[in-house]
């Protein structure tokens, strides 16, 4: 097992040659070794088949249709901040707010029901999944744990919850079909022996979507806000852009990604710069050499797990001037020249394993950040720990991160 952070080798591994994912690592992400989820396929052909089955539901047109559902969840987050301003002096735990909102959005868009984490503070399903996430983090770096007899599998609550909601959907598929991702998965179910998409597979996919679709997006939102409150001059420029696209005080007009996502380039630059400095996938999704290779002059035997450490490349001074600094402006010229794909920048990985939910995440981030910035002023609260850890996704080690929030005055 080795780690590589050379810009050219990382690009070769994850993009140019598109090495398959590591069996040693991703074998740990399977409830049933013979039934991997999309994230855990290591066979390229089998992965391509499952991706074809699912990828159509992550098309831009369908994702745009989910905006009203996402907005409902964000409205609850706005109300939560309003309550904190009125009752808690405007001190808001933005880490848990972003995470709770992301969980509620996944619940609404996949399961057809919000988990109301922002409103109630918790829900059994995401609580169980958070424990699974910690266990997965251990397995990522200590795969030998897999060999321990009677190692715990997926919690029974998760199996019961997902199976129950799936069976209810199957029963009402014709009489009252819903327009969400779970419904589309259920429509592809096949109980026949030898089927490539069984109820077990649906359980696995929706569970992974909930985990992968919350931690990565929520932390990208949090780190973007954190970078902005650390740099008030950048924050003021973002406010000016938000106000130019959505006139101050006109909160009746909803945020619309079709209208503003591509045009609000400075906000996007702030997001990209935050994802460069603190990428969710810091280790770049572990790959495997399927033949003897040479990496940076060293022989790498077939079967070696290789961590293409994208964060190392994102911080490389030979690639990025002032690499350790938060400089959103660097992206504006990149956008203008249409050279984003040419950058050594892989927050969503690359090649055939680029994140299938990339556009879902970018839409959610845009809706969340623009909605909050239209209404509130955010202020940095010093003295808090800001160390990050990596457990499947990179996030704050501390259980909370607060900011001072005030209503904007127009």
Curated annotation (Swiss-Prot):
EC category name: oxidoreductase
UniProt entry tagged with the keyword Flavoprotein: no
EC number: 1.-.-.-
Residues that coordinate or bind heme: 355
GO molecular function: heme binding; iron ion binding; monooxygenase activity; oxidoreductase activity, acting on paired donors, with incorporation or reduction of molecular oxygen
Top-level lineage group: Eukaryota
PROSITE patterns: CYTOCHROME_P450
Keywords: Heme, Iron, Metal-binding, Monooxygenase, Oxidoreductase
Entry-linked InterPro entries: Cyt_P450 (IPR001128), Cyt_P450_CS (IPR017972), Cyt_P450_E_grp-I (IPR002401), Cyt_P450_sf (IPR036396), Cytochrome_P450_monoxygenase (IPR050121)
Pathway recorded for this protein: Secondary metabolite biosynthesis
Cofactors that this protein relies on: heme
Family: Belongs to the cytochrome P450 family.
Function: Cytochrome P450 monooxygenase; part of the gene cluster that mediates the biosynthesis of macrophasetins, 3-decalinoyltetramic acids (DTAs) which feature a tetramate (pyrrolidine-2,4-dione) unit connected to a decalin fragment and that have potent bioactivities. The PKS-NRPS mpsA together with its associated enoylreductase partner mpsG incorporate one unit of acetyl-CoA, seven units of malonyl-CoA, and one unit of L-alanine to assemble the linear tetramic acid intermediate corresponding to the backbone of macrophasetins.
Protein name: Cytochrome P450 monooxygenase mpsF
Organism taxonomic ancestry: Eukaryota, Fungi, Dikarya, Ascomycota, Pezizomycotina
């Amino acid at each position: 097992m080795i780690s590589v952070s050379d810009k050219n080798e990382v690009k070769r591994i994850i993009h140019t040659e598109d090495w398959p994912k590591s069996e040693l690592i991703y074998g740990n992400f399977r409830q049933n070794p013979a039934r991997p989820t999309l994230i855990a396929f290591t066979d390229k052909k089998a992965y391509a088949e499952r991706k074809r089955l699912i990828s159509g539901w992550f098309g831009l047109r369908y994702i745009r249709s989910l905006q009203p559902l996402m907005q409902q969840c964000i409205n609850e987050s706005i109300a939560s901040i309003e309550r904190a301003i009125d009752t808690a002096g405007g001190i808001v735990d933005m880490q848990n707010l972003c995470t709770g909102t992301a969980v509620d959005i996944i619940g609404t868009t996949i399961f057809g029901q919000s988990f109301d984490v922002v409103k109630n503070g918790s829900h059994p399903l995401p609580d169980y999944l958070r424990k699974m996430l910690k266990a997965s983090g251990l397995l990522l770096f200590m795969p030998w744990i897999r060999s321990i007899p009677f190692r715990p599998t997926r919690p029974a609550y998760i199996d019961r919850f997902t199976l129950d909601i799936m069976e209810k959907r199957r029963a009402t598929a014709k009489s009252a079909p819903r327009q969400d991702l779970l419904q589309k998965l259920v429509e592809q179910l096949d109980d026949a022996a030898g089927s490539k998409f069984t109820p077990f597979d649906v359980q696995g996919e929706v569970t992974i979507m909930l985990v992968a679709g919350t931690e990565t997006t929520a932390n990208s939102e949090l780190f973007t806000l954190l970078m902005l409150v650390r740099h008030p001059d950048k924050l003021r420029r973002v406010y000016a852009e938000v106000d130019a696209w959505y006139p101050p005080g006109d909160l009746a007009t909803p945020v619309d990604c079709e209208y503003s996502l591509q045009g609000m380039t400075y906000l996007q630059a702030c997001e990209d710069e935050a994802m460069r400095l603190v990428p969710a996938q810091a280790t770049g999704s572990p790959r495997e050499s399927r033949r003897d290779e040479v990496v940076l002059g060293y022989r790498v035997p077939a079967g070696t797990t290789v961590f293409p450490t994208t964060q190392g490349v994102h911080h490389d001074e030979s690639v990025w001037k002032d690499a350790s600094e938060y400089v959103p402006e660097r992206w504006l010229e990149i956008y203008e020249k249409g050279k984003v794909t040419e950058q050594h920048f892989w927050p969503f990985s690359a090649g055939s394993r680029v994140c299938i939910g990339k556009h879902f995440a970018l839409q959610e981030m845009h809706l969340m950040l623009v909605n909050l910035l239209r209404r509130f002023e955010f202020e940095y609260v010093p003295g808090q720990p800001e160390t990050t850890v990596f457990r499947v996704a990179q996030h704050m080690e501390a259980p909370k991160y607060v900011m001072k929030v005030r209503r904007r005055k127009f």
